[in-house]
């Protein structure tokens, strides 16, 4: 018993911050938005901006198990879609490849763009694909700045970088708007997600057709809906061509497992870029196509990878091939949905938005529903979710969700129900003060024609999302308005962990344990959204914000120290081939070079590409429509080591190299460092010697 007690106390020690942490007071001034001029013509603009940070940021999602990013493979983006209905209403729909949105980022972005664009706080949503290989130390609360990654505290430089990049993206989309047409739609797709918490899902009162004995049940108990808002704009010759899609699919971006070492967009990268490249090629658009694919109700939706069972004492291997296959399947479904909407495009656009900002600890009742005033972490959070467990802790019954030891059997009548508090009920607040938890929700509704988007800062389970959507749709129906598509955008404008139904909560799986505000969270959120929907239909404008946007947050530094480089860029190791040795691995060609340090490398700018020698000329390479550069799928850039004179060693890996050509790596200019070229090389799969090493040529 004492050993178990010590283990639980050690577990709760992960909630501790060093006493010397610096607290920063941050104030964001609420702007006065400009008036949006009525032009009578719907307009739109869209842009993709890079938000890949320097090496060294802790990656979020896997908490203390996560690595710090050594570099990237598939860049992190913020995709912005600006839409104006011509009647004085506009929205900025922002999808990011981050683990979660941030209310602080949303506030800073609103403050940066409102006076120029007229966009109000209710008009801007910042969603996240929920990649578990992206930075997260940008929240307005200490709790998730401590516990969502392996680093503790707000990283001010990343906060400023992400906020500024998103604001710049909104401004660029706004300034490049063109006459627009819009279409909305839905397609149900199967075989891409599965329910990872089936034993909770079947407890829902309205679920009668799912059996735990059915091996296919986990593929049926899902949200299959892919939603999409397609936008075309007019080119210089008066022809309408595709510009963007803002879409949603419910799936955890955890196709890549815990040991991954570089920033990435997980399976979303493939689903996003496949559509962008395919549509741009087909329609020969004079602008880059933007596919802002975000997440929906992915709380209990795992990627439908091969099921290897649970992991108790270790992590599964990183499998990029499996992530790519699944992501490209989703991408093909998105392309088909996009194309099917061609005949639905209309220049008649109606935009309505509403927002109500609430401190839910201070405003924890609505009608007869009372939310917990004090949040609490359940014991199952320590052991993690199915397939992505915390090794060894998952072997402790009290910590592994879903079993009889992980939930309380006495004193279960309160708002936290049968949750067993991690570290015990009365000790947890000593390690984690309740004031450190997130408390402010921006309830928001965005209506574009017959589609209603409901952004929420929660990971919402499938059935929870259905109940919220029904509540909001019913409110609109009472006013004679038929909403065809109603969908939750999870992880948006902040992060609060999970929300399950009351029935699912009783099982106390990971999702229920991570429902901080208790068993009535979903009824409370549904009621608040329903009230907002009612007010949206009865009031001219609903925009209710807190009186001030002020935060006191513990800060830390993960960005590299700013050191001016004084050395000279040079090659270190010429291209060499590394063969895959396991089923989950890929062949790659590696090149190493000396370059400016981490503070100057600017990973958010293009850095590496592959060129092929064709008819005596070096041409930037493409393979089956995919550019072979660091904006594609197969180039990975990583920092190997710091060196003297402010310099650092880097490596680029070209995974899945194409046989039969003559190639070279090209490193883009940085500061005063000139463009750098590797020696040329070939790759041949039919020559044993050539597959063990690249053959270099001196030009």
Model-derived features with residue positions:
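Non-catalytic substrate/cofactor recognition surfaces at enzyme active-site rims
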Residues: 21-699
């Amino acid at each position: 018993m004492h050993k178990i007690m010590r283990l639980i106390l050690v577990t709760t020690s992960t909630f501790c911050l060093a006493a010397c942490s610096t607290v920063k007071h941050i104030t964001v001034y609420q702007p006065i938005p400009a008036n949006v001029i009525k032009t009578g013509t719907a307009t739109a603009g869209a842009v993709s901006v890079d938000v890949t940070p320097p090496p060294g940021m802790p990656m979020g999602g896997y908490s203390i198990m996560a690595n710090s990013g050594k570099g990237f493979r598939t860049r992190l983006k913020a995709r912005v879609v600006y839409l104006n209905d011509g009647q004085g209403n506009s929205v900025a729909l922002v999808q990011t490849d981050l683990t979660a949105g941030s209310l602080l980022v949303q506030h800073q972005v609103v403050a940066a763009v409102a006076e120029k664009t007229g966009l109000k706080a209710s008009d801007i949503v910042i969603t996240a694909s929920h990649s578990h290989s992206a930075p997260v130390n940008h929240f307005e609360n200490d709790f998730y700045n401590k516990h969502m990654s392996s680093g503790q505290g707000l990283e001010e430089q990343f906060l400023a970088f992400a906020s500024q990049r998103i604001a710049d993206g909104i401004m660029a989309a706004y300034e490049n708007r063109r006459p627009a047409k819009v279409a909305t739609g839905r397609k149900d797709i199967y075989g891409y997600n599965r329910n990872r918490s089936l034993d909770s899902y079947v407890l829902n009162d309205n679920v009668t057709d799912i059996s735990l004995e059915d091996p296919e049940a986990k593929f049926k108990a899902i949200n299959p809906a892919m939603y999409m808002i397609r936008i075309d704009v007019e080119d210089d010759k008066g022809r309408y061509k595709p510009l963007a899609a803002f879409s949603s699919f419910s799936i955890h971006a955890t196709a890549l497992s815990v040991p991954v070492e570089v920033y990435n967009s997980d399976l979303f990268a493939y689903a996003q870029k496949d559509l962008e490249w395919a549509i741009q090629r087909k329609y020969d658009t004079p602008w880059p196509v933007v596919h802002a694919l975000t997440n929906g109700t992915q709380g209990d939706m795992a990627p439908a990878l091969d099921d290897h069972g649970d992991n108790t004492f270790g992590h599964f291997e990183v499998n990029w091939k499996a992530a790519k296959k699944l992501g490209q399947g989703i991408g093909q479904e998105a392309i088909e949905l996009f194309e099917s909407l061609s005949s639905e495009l209309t220049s008649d656009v109606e935009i309505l938005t509403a927002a109500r900002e609430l401190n839910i600890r201070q405003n924890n009742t609505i009608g007869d529903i009372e939310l917990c005033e004090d949040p609490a972490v359940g014991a199952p959070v320590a052991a993690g979710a199915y397939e992505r467990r915390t090794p060894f802790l998952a072997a402790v019954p009290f910590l592994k969700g879903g079993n009889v030891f992980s939930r309380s059997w006495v004193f279960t009548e309160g708002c936290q129900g049968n949750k067993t508090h991690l570290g015990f009920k009365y000790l947890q607040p000593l390690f984690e003060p309740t004031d450190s938890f997130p408390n402010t929700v921006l309830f928001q509704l965005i209506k574009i024609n017959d589609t209603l988007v409901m952004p929420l800062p929660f990971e919402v389970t499938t059935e929870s999302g259905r109940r919220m959507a029904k509540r909001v749709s019913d409110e609109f129906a009472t006013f004679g308005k038929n909403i065809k598509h109603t969908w939750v955008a999870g992880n948006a404008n902040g992060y609060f962990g999970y929300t399950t139904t009351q029935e699912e909560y009783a099982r106390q799986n990971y999702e229920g344990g991570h429902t901080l505000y208790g068993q009535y969270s979903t009824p409370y959120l549904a009621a608040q959204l329903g009230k907002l929907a009612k007010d949206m239909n009865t009031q001219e404008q609903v925009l209710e914000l807190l009186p001030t946007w002020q935060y006191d947050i513990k800060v830390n530094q993960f960005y590299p120290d700013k050191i001016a480089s004084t050395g000279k860029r040079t090659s270190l190791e010429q291209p060499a081939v590394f063969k895959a040795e396991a089923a989950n691995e890929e062949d790659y060609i590696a090149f190493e070079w000396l370059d400016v340090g981490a503070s100057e490398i600017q990973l958010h700018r293009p850095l590496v590409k592959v060129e092929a020698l064709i008819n005596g000329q070096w041409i930037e390479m493409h393979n089956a429509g995919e550019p072979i550069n660091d904006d594609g799928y197969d180039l990975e850039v990583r920092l190997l080591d710091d060196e003297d004179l402010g310099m650092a060693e880097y490596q680029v890996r070209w995974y899945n190299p194409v046989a039969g050509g003559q190639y070279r790596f090209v490193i883009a200019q940085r500061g005063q460092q000139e463009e750098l070229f590797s020696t040329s090389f070939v790759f041949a799969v039919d020559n044993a010697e050539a597959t063990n090493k690249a053959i270099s040529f001196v030009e």
